[in-house]
Amino acid sequence: MKLNLAVVGATGLVGQTMLKVLSERNVEIGELYLYASARSKGKKVLYNGKEYKIIELNDENIRADIDIALFSAGADISKEYAPKFAKNGTVVIDNSSFFRMDENVPLVVPEVNSDKIKDNKIIANPNCSTITVIPALKYIDDKYGIKRVVYSTYQSVSGAGQQGLQDLENNLKGEKSTKFTSQIAFNLIPYIDKFDENTGYTKEELKMINETRKILSKPDMKITATCVRVPVRYSHAVSVNLELEKSFDLEALKAGLAKSAGVVLEDLPMPIDVEGKDKTYVGRVRRDFSVENGLNLWIVADNIRKGAATNAVQIAQQIILLKEVNG
């Protein structure tokens, strides 16, 4: 079934990767509409050998014949335009944070909760670091129950977009950062996004905490997080410490992880090795002997692909499948 698709934010890092993933996965598209800001109007983008002109995103240019729109243009754009697209009957898959905690909007990782898609006109893509850990945590929680989670993230500069990548390159030439508040080359920045005045956590850390609870349907799950920016171009890594409700056989747990959808079990997954891939890679699986039923994991995924673009395209594919089944 060929549906009409739009990509909003088509000139950005994630938007460009969405187009790449759509092509790689051979998603059948009727008409393709590529939107961006006024400064990109008229710019030409190549998709499957055909040139498409960028359409300026404004009220006048919202089309009624778009079946699915992939949004990756930031929370302010999603806030303003996603409801306008949805009002026309378009299903919006939004990569921003704006709708994620809306109780009426499903937060979807297809390997985990594709059943939540149903008839919703707006579907939220989780945060890139949340997507990285959720496939593994879903299996563990279903099988053994999770009492407590401790996240420590190592997030690449591409999580801050093209400007983040440029800062790293510029720093290596001896130039100052413009996106980050500090030098990122040969350095670690111990926070991501703004600080929450009430908790001392950053917005990025609160996203991981709240999104994990929502996706796993455990609003009271005990979770803490520390998110750190590291001088790596692509792929986020997360050290995960868990306290489980049930005792476990380590080898049986690892075998179950290896069979989980979207998960690849490896001894030592590294950011550079998973770049360009669409799975989440789990390694360093071992007991935490400091607590009863404790478990440590190291999880890595390409933040631009599985952490953003690929997850959104997978949701789109699920929607197409539902339309084919339901006619």
What function would you assign to each model-found segment?
Residues 233-238:
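Conserved glycine-rich beta-strand-loop-beta hairpin in the small C-terminal domain of fold type I
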Residues 187-232:
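Oxyanion-binding "anion nests"
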Residues 258, 263-284:
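A glycine-rich dinucleotide-binding beta-alpha-beta segment and adjacent secondary-structure elements
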